[in-house]
Amino acid sequence: MGTAAGSRRNAFVSRRASETVNLYRAVRAVTDSGGDGPVDWTAVGTAARAATAPGDLTLSAAERQGYADDVGDARDAIRAAAGVEFDLPAHVEVQNRHHWVDANVATFRRVLSPLSDRIELTPALARSANTASMAVALGFLANNVLGQYDPLLLGDGDHQLYFVHPNIESAATTLDVDRDRFRRWIAFHEVAHAAEFGAAPWLPERLERGVETAVSELADGGLDREAMRELDVTMTAVEGYAELVMDRAFDREYADLREKLDERRGGSGPVSVLLRRLLGVGRKRRQYERGKAFFEAVAKARGVEAAAAVWDRPENLPTDEELDDPEAWLSRVYRE
């Protein structure tokens, strides 16, 4: 008994020591940040990785095949349910948290580049604060993101699809749900996003323009509320349609997965709740709900395939008012 207690105590001390060292490394990376721009992105990546355990990425051949099968099945089921044609990235990545940080440092840097273009010299203290904020945001997200379809906005490469395996494992355990079914559900959600961008070749450019306008306005000290509103409406359509088609296409029970995941979000500690609000995670949940209600009403009136008309051309996107009045959207889009 004493030996077991001693082992647990030693493991606890070792873990706390490791956490302390990692925290020191994260703080040191921020304080050592350099350059002239508003954010030292190299330091952001270093600090976020230091403050975040990478997680285990030891997968059996069966587990790797499970990811591949889930993605392939999701593609076929969503094509059939939604009546849209789309392709997936050539390779699906299964990542740990550090891999996700590395990929998204590049994304954040790309999206926020207008800030660097307009702000040539930044005081060291402000740069350290900006760097710390970005590192905290990425570290928090790296511990929570389960999967991600990346259309590579503002980039030149191919679209990407990846899953953060340690987070899927951890969430399935915390929620007390079957891991394989949970992983499959996440795959269907991310593939649903791939379907949207495949069905709407104009969508990446629209989002890029919205993001560039919003960030440029912020860099100039202003806030283009109309641009932000348009971006929010577009993202509400993106999130809502994905919810509709993943629910219609998924081949297993999922109500308990959604309920438990929502409970997990709502039951977070105060620091987590604050970060979710600052990062707009709560807004994304509202986008899910509002967008899904809109598309459910459209599907009920005319079928799931009719909802795909939203991606035929930019003008078919619902307005902010139409999101709460699906009949008005149906009358406008199908008046012919």
Model features per residue range: what roles?
Residues 1-103, 180, 306-336:
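N-terminal low-structure segments adjacent to metalloprotease catalytic domains
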